[in-house]
Amino acid sequence: PNYQVNPIDVQGLYEAEKSLFGISINGTTLIPCEYFAQNHCTIGDFFAGIFYLCWVPVPIAFGLWLYWKGERKVYLRFAMFFPLVNLIGFAGYYIHPAAPPWYAMNYGFEPVLDTPGNVAGLGRFDELLGCSIFHSIYGRNANVFAAVPSLHAAYMVVALAYAAMGHCKKWLIALFAFIMVGIWCTAVYSGHHYLIDVLLGIFCALLGIFAFEKGLMKWGAFKRFFERYSKYIR
C-alpha cells in the first residue's frame, strides 16, 4: 500500500484547499466540497452521477470507435498512452498518499488505515434512482488514501486531446469537452476530490501527452516499432 511508502496527507491538503479555494459563509470558511455537501440540488445530483459514470466507458468507447473507423494510428497512440498516464497517476499515489475530502469531512484528520470506501455525494444519485451503482463501486474501494492526482480528471483530457489530434468531428470534440468539465465539477461536487486533486490530474494528463508525443514518438526505436505495429493491425 502507498501509505507504507510515505505518510498520508489528510490535514495539509484540506488546509491548502481552504486557503486557495475557500468559500466564506457567515464568517466560516468552507472548502468547496463542504459547500456543495450543504448546497446541492436534485438536477445537480443526477447529472453528477451521469458524468462520473462516463469517466472510463467514454474513453474506451472512443478507442473502439477509432479502431472500427480505421483510424489505426490515432487509435494506437491513444491506446499506448493510457498505461503512461496511469503510471504517472500511480506514482503520484505513492509519492504523496492523500485522503479525499469526504474523509476529512467525516473522520477528521487522523488517518485510519482500515477506513472503508465511501460513496460520498454520489450516494444521492443512487437514492434518486433507487439503485446501488456507486455504492457497489466505492463500497469495495480497498485503499481510500489515493486521491492525488485525480485520474477521474485526467482520462477525459486524454480522450479530448486525441479527438482533437485525430481531427474528429467538431460535435464530438465539443461533447468530450462538456463531459470532461462535467467530471471535473462532479469530482468536487460529490466530495471525492479537492480542486487541487483535479488540477493535478489535469497536469498529469498534459505531462503524459507531452512526454509521449514529444518524447517517445520522436525516439527512433519506438517510432519504428510504432510504424510496424500500426501496419500490422490495419
PLM features: residue spans?
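N-terminal transmembrane-helix/juxtamembrane module of multi-pass inner/ER membrane proteins
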Residues: 1-59, 233
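Membrane-interfacial alpha-helical segments at the cytosolic side of multi-pass membrane proteins
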Residues: 61-68, 153-170, 203-214
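Membrane-proximal cytoplasmic C-terminal regulatory module of class A 7TM GPCRs
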Residues: 211-234
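Alpha-helical transmembrane segments of multipass membrane proteins
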Residues: 85-93, 183, 204-212
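Interfacial segments of alpha-helical transmembrane regions
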Residues: 60-96, 102-112, 176
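Interfacial helix-loop-helix junctions of multi-pass membrane proteins
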Residues: 100-104, 147, 182-208
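Membrane-interface loop-to-helix entry segments
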Residues: 43-58, 143-165, 195, 199
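Membrane-interfacial catalytic/cofactor-binding modules of polytopic membrane enzymes
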Residues: 95-166
